[in-house]
Amino acid sequence: STAALLLLPDETILAYHLRDFVSMLDHSIPKRTFQAIQEKMERKVLCIPSNHERIRLAHGLNVGFSSANAAGVHLILLADYLDLKGIAFGTPIDNTWLKSGRTFRDFSQSHYWKYWEGQFSKAGLSYVLPINHISEAGAMEICKQSVLSESVNSCLRGVDGKWCGKCWKCFHKNGPLGRKIDPHSKEITTFLSAKPLRTAQHALWALQKQNLQYLAPQFNSHF
């Protein structure tokens, strides 16, 4: 999370879980962001290759992270080597105080928080969520006001540093930043038609921000 990076102390170690096998994901966009971080902030991002996401194949599932916090598995394994005291994740309010981005919950008392805070504690690490109280829209605003405003980009489907404009991330992150997207793409249409709507609060905001409310008339009463 670039927003989390901008809020955390300068001595924070920046690390990226690099999928190290052939897949649909393209790392050229994040790598350009890392280059900008080095040039504009004089900080380096530690890129650690991993095939961890293939573990799901053994269970008949698609490639992907095995749990909500598996994106930090590289840092858990290197915690002693890097002398880490904790690991921070860029989880926004849409997935903390708002359960699935739809309904309020007391996150501090939730099973999710108690379980994962406990698991990290057993490993001698603090479980840190620096933007747990900030919406995705708020996180985007933090990035817009930074030196990385032109460099930050969440798309992992683009090629040669250019975002694809067709994925869900492009819809709710690149679109609101004024970047060109295809709002009628198969993936965006599928997600907007899903019930319940994924990360509903932010999705509705993204529709309004881009004047695309007509794509989801079933939510007119919420605009």
Feature map (PLM): residue ranges:
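Nucleotide-activated chemistry modules centered on ATP-dependent adenylation/adenylyltransferase
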Residues: T2, L6-F223
